[in-house]
Amino acid sequence: MTGVGENQLISIQPDELKFLFELEKQSYCDLKVANKTENYVAFKVKTTSPKKYFVRPNTGVIQPWDSCIIRVTLQAQREYPPDMQCKDKFLLQSTIVPPHTDVDELPQDTFTKDSGKTLTECKLKVSYITPSTTQRSSESGATNGDGQSSETISTIQRLKEERDAAVKQTQQLQHELETVRRRRNQRNSGNGLSLKLAAMVGLIGLIIGFILKLTLASPT
């Protein structure tokens, strides 16, 4: 078994899973797994708390010198862990497989240690970060003259303002569109009524004309 982030077959970045922890909210961390060999390498991700995390993909095959992204999602939690300390751990197993092997073709004993094949393992620790910690880090960076942090905050604020303006404009356009629809419906309703009146007047005229014709045609 190799150390954190170290593996003879693959490289893993980052070497620690860090999640922004907020109650009733999901959080995720992406792992980049790169194949460092000229062979096809299969991998499998295991965790000590499988009900707490959602891993996709948790099993896969990486082509030679290629890489893939594994997304580990922390499910929404209802309470804070003691002292915000996380004892969860992840284990990433990897082994060489025949060329052009598909993940659906992997035998059940691919990641079994007594299968006679070389199986390397890499442990990953888990840590939680609170929003307040992130905010303090940003403020500390600004205090130390980190212009990039202040620039990032300004960018976020600008994006929020643009989003609010776009939402307001969308609502205004929807209101105007609804007004146009109401006016058009009223106009169509008025035109329908006018046509009905015209039809009735025409019908009455025909009846009167028919009666007059009969009257004139009657012998005196």
Swiss-Prot record:
Modified residues (N-acetylthreonine): T2
Chain's role: May play a role in vesicle trafficking.
N-acetylmethionine PTM positions: M1
Transmembrane segments annotated in the record for this chain: 197-217
Keywords per UniProt: Acetylation, Coiled coil, Endoplasmic reticulum, Membrane, Transmembrane, Transmembrane helix
Cytoplasmic-facing ranges: 1-196
Annotated segments matching region Disordered: 133-154
This protein's GO CC annotations: endoplasmic reticulum; endoplasmic reticulum membrane; plastid
Gene: PVA21
Location in the cell: Endoplasmic reticulum membrane
Coiled-coil zones: 153-188
Membrane topology summary: Single-pass type IV membrane protein
Listed InterPro entries: Ig-like_fold (IPR013783), MSP_dom (IPR000535), PapD-like_sf (IPR008962), VAP (IPR016763)
Entry protein name: Vesicle-associated protein 2-1
Protein family membership: Belongs to the VAMP-associated protein (VAP) (TC 9.B.17) family.
Source taxonomy: Eukaryota, Viridiplantae, Streptophyta, Embryophyta, Tracheophyta
Domain spans labelled MSP: 9-129
